[in-house]
């Protein structure tokens, strides 16, 4: 609410005001005016209503809002008026007989802390109507007598609030700010009514935070805001020197009001209503920032005062900044005063206590009031505090001198908005009201009335900087607040703005404060008895007068925006808090109080730094460790490779899982198992699936296998017979050197081979059980096929009988068909890649040139930036003289294309001969699965004729013959082939457009050549025409012997691998990403016993096939038995 706005429910109770000109009327006349203004005061029937009116008036008093400077020039006159009024205020009709009053009411009121004379007079005036009426009367009387003001406020609340335990309040010695207007007498609560009003309701803990704030409706509150919180009113007006205090620098860009005029509240306190204060209060009243009361949660004493819901903590509000003399104190009355972000440090306790004892200049020792420092520094201009002046006069000794705010009022720093930030445990400071309550009894009688020692947790403004008595000890209970000392006993959470009080020139203790000012140590002054010996204000300790207000040089910086978001900059915070902490031993008491604040805050300091620091400390051990991690940093391309292949394999695994489940269901249906048996089988499959997922993550290495013998050596790998260490099972292990795969650009081919071997779920393809890799090599662990390959058999036999050729070609047709059904093209069907198992049936192997037309099978996918390397399907310079290449002439394309084709001829690539490769593959004109049927025709020719149809001296000539197959293909008559065999060869070895098999393998199966083959039955179940001879499980006699010179030696392997791979790494390449998703483990791996244990050759031979193919059903039923598994396999 803007200052000039009138809150809802505003009542025109604006008392008479004094003229702006110098006041020259006599004291008697002034007293008359004041009395007239008092008659106009509203008289609410009950305290709550009065409080409500108070809140309205206090927050709405237009005089306070709009004419704050009006009395700025009347300090001297007001002081004179005060002096003249003091005798009247002190007059008590104690002579009246108590017989005229209700003894019970008298006793209750006295118990509440009211002076006997005051109570008797009130009861007499109200005809013993009710305690509330008496309290209301006392409230009016308190306008005339400052000491009564505090007692009325302190005592009335407990009574009206049914003496709620939470209503423990401390009387605040407050000097009435007799500005000559009843406005100054009326509690100036300009905030929203009760609920929102900063004015503390009688039940509100804040009401006590308005230390001495009178009952609502009573003018006491007005005085409370402006007067000492000791409950004692300093009757003798302070000398006019009070004016000497220069106004503090205007907040945030406001020009300082002329001296002697009370500037309107700072812009940051929109709702603060400047109150009229007595001349004494003209002194800068320490700006009360929303400092959380004493120890509440987190060490702050719980808000002892029963915070009435009417007075919710004003979290958004900020305390009042110190206002210099001549400047109206900023009254934080409206709960909307300071809508500090609740996140503000000051709001950490949830109460943005704008209520903070705005009236408190001095906080009792027990009170730990955290008041965020004003955004601007207090200047030494506030030469003498009203208390200092008063000490010189009849006023009670001020707890702070020279305009310096009492330690309780002092704010450690902007960051110390919460009690936890302040050292609630300050030695001298009594955080617990109960302690301070005992102090009140000891405190010098400030108001002559002993204010009940309700002991709310008194949050004292910890002026860690200003507080010369850094230890709250300075606020000892014995110490008596000066007349101007407003000892605000703020209930733990000050939920309502405290009544306005003179705020000392704001201390630049914000988080952005330039530097921690060198505070002048302030001598601890002994407490002087207040001029009016009134009962000791409970819990009201007098702050010794501050020697001198801190002097800042230059105006403070404006609040930065980030402060409003609870991010006070860390450096200022440290500059303020740390110096006091480090210099603690030598610092004056004010710094000691800051130390106490530091002590309390120490536990939360780091956390606070984390929350308030805008700068994140990056350099820590964890970060360094993270940087030093051994995990390699891969390129984005590597991530692309991994994710593309990983996602594909994850989806594939899911599909395979569904397939296995369906397969099991079909098998159980076919077998006709009972329901219980089916359920058991399903459970077993589920368990096996779970185990499989776990096993797939198990790392494998070559140490798990023992090499027995080398079976063959290829272009960049070798095949050897190996035994698995744990299961003793025999496997054929194919090892590929990564360096050769990379250099020959065979990554795509290896990936394609791995895929087809892993996906192959039929008996025509060698089964892959495991694939894994290490730093240097890739490993395929496959079925060991002891019968050797077709080439070895061809070499031994020379020419096959047509019946044997028919049998093998029929099985080869079925094998190629199975590969095509899986979506692959072998592209390298030749006798070397056809293996014969122990029962004489064939299996396809070596899918190094196989492709599935997948992006992972494309060599270009694995090439980055360099010029493209040629794969094994390109022409090799070993084929002949490159100058004889006629690719350009033959293709007749653009010259660039011809040049590229010629480069292919020059490129190193294919190892071996192109005898079995279809012409479209060599020409790269585009090919389909039909290219494999070409190879079948060539193999049939070789079986029956004894040599390939396109045999030549060099690979290049062979390639030329293949390309010119129309003229080079001749079936020699001496071979004496049957017309069916010749016709089949001719129909398979022709152009793809009319090649047999174009419409599927059935075309081939229907050819007359296979008229004696029953493709409808499983060929593998038929007896083979040739059964290889196997003498023992590790018999390798069916394989051609390996040249010892070509054998891999471990030493050479290490040297070659290291040299080659080091070269790759030196060039900045990371080829390892080419082998992502290479690892594989078969679901049905025969438990590691593809052939069981070695048995007699005959027995093994008979049951070999069954043992190779696993049956999930049998596997689950027989447990360790591994034979006859042919139902479920992958």
UniProtKB/Swiss-Prot annotation:
Pfam families: Pkinase (PF00069), Pkinase_C (PF00433), UBA (PF00627). CDD domains: MobB_LATS1, STKc_LATS1, UBA_LATS1. It is an enzyme of class 2 (transferase). It comes from the Eukaryota. The active site is at residue 828. GO terms for biological process: cell division; G1/S transition of mitotic cell cycle; G2/M transition of mitotic cell cycle; hippo signaling; hormone-mediated signaling pathway; inner cell mass cell fate commitment; inner cell mass cellular morphogenesis; keratinocyte differentiation. This is Serine/threonine-protein kinase LATS1.
